[in-house]
Amino acid sequence: MLDLAIVGGGPGGLMSAWYLKKKLGGLCNITIFEASDRLGGKVLTGRFDSAPAVYEAGVAEIYDYSMTGPDPLRELVQHFGLQTIQMDAEQVQLDGELLNDVPGMRRKYGAKTADAIEAFRKRCSKMVSPLEYYEGIGAHDNEHPWAYITAEEVLDREIDDPTAKRFFKVMARSDIATETHNTNGLNALKNFVMDVEGYIGLYSIQNGNDQLIECLRSEIDADIRLNHRVLKVGKTEGGRYQLRMVNGKGPETHDFDLVLMCLPHSWLSTMAWDGEDLRKSMVKHVAYFDRPAHYLRISILFDKPFWGDQIPGAWFMSEAFGGCCVYNEGARHDVGQHGVLNWLVAGSDALAFANLGDKALIDMALKSLPASLGDARAHFKEGKTHRWLSSVNALPGGLPARDVMTNHRPEPKQHPGLVLVGDYLFDSTLNGLLDSSDAATDIILTEMMRLRRKQGQDGKLLSDKIDRNYFENYRGLGPYHEVWNQFTDPAFLVDLIKKVWNRAKGYKLLVAGSASGELVGALRARGIDAWGIENNRAIHGKTPKELKKFNKLGSIVDMPFKNGEFDFVFETSLCHVPNKRVVPAIRELNRVVKTGLMFGSVTSDMPAPLIDRYDLLRGVKKLGTWWEWSELFFNNGFDLSMHRHDCTDALWTATLAANKGPGQWYADSDSLRYSFFDKVEDED
């Protein structure tokens, strides 16, 4: 069994361990090393000493994307059976007065300011749609007109009214956690639209966001070692990864087959890296994302909510501390008869004021409240502070945005099993962190399957050749021409095409990886104008005479077909193409197809027993998960068919009926979802 280390016991480390159990089962031993004496990192729910009142000392809330599409974090919260509380508010404090969004701004500052606010929000809605917002960080961001100008420049260009400009700075400061000159216009834009209906919802977990940490901990299978700070990562002479660390007693050294680094960017910067290739790669990685942003928490307990009904929402935005969010914790948590206000100070103010003592910070927070609320000091009972310096990123995802593989695996040649996890790689949210954990564990899964095969099966080394013997005993069942239809059912294929693209007949289809043409012949017998291409000369030579015209010998990297000659492509051969030629092969498939492609290659996230049973990794040169393959398709002229016509449930029903579900090929409906791609034009 292989050994895997997770460095960091924060939410990223726990999410990764949870995903690994889900994806790998018991295929590896997992050890989590956490430098502190607790799990959870910046997900921290606090309790006051003088009363059993709850407040969020770390992550303030969770983003809800479910109104637009699948929301993995929301689904995870539901999986654990956790209850959630929706959060909303519209108030902003300017010039000492609490105002109700645009109507309040209109009343106090006049129509010119209010109209400027509404006009800029409309402009923002045109600059990024709810669907584009939902899709998050990606290569498409690099083409956005606000990507290469600062947020400060955007505000200066788009808003003439100085009060309206100040309004937007205050409203967004606690989200971007930095100054408008330190981030780009696109990142600010994605925060400006959070106040526009239809983009996002916000919620908190009942009884504290740290319930998520407790639930993750309860479902993972790992050896957790607290107070173990990893200092250096390198490699042994035998090729394993070596971690050097200290605990409460002294130094330790441990070796692993695979390593997940689940550290905040600031802590990643403190690590030492053994070996020049790794050191250079990690220095470049750290530098690329070195845009620290800061938070400071000031949480205050009062004897009662003395403000009465003056704070009707879950928070209000305040111009204090350069623009901060003040949460009314009683709107989401049980604070008893008490009142709790919780300041989220951001950016340079958080960095500067973090140098002050707790008493001074609490005093400043009390002074910042609008006088209309009443005498805050008369009701003060207790205050707590929490400093989260460099805990988030001023430009999450980096600029320009890079592909997911590059971000998560900085040195793939000599250190393919060293993978990173971080919210800074996506959008500096818990949602982004879960996405990062999912992506990173997919990479780990692929590497683990490679290592398993390298070690052999039942102590025997396995052949990697696609030779005559391979086809004479195809996947251990017998001659290819006798057993091919146990893996490819022409009726099932035709049914899937009908469900996804609503085409039952009258189309032309290419089978990419057609062997001796049996599938081509079966499809033609059904009235489909099917053609094939196969690069293995031996098996292609067995093509029946009547199919030779339709089953071509050649490579999918350079095909003898016209542009857009086929309506659809069914491919099973991309995984057998060398890594360097995969992208050219996908582009060539894109060239010859008009409508869509069905992906049928072997993937690393197919169930291990299925892979072992049929030795599916034999001859595979490009191994990846369904998700990794989808990224390659996205970057080369394709998009998920389900984005335009989501028929996942119908596909899954058909798959189960055809006996192609769990234990046969498709483990779940998600694997089907990532098997169908539409050809798209650049402007799409």
Q: What are these model-predicted stretches?
A:
Residues 21-49:
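Glycine-rich FAD pyrophosphate-binding loop
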Residues 77-183, 454:
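Mobile amphipathic helical/loop "lid" adjacent to a hydrophobic cofactor/ligand pocket
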Residues 583-597:
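A short glycine-rich, Lys/Arg-flanked "PGG" loop and its adjoining helix->strand segment in the class I
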Residues 452-558, 586, 670-682:
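Conserved N-terminal segment of class I S-adenosyl-L-methionine
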Residues 132-229, 236-241, 255, 267, ...:
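Active-site/ligand-binding neighborhood in enzyme catalytic cores
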Residues 55-58, 597-621:
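Short, glycine-/aromatic-enriched active-site segment of Class I SAM-dependent methyltransferases
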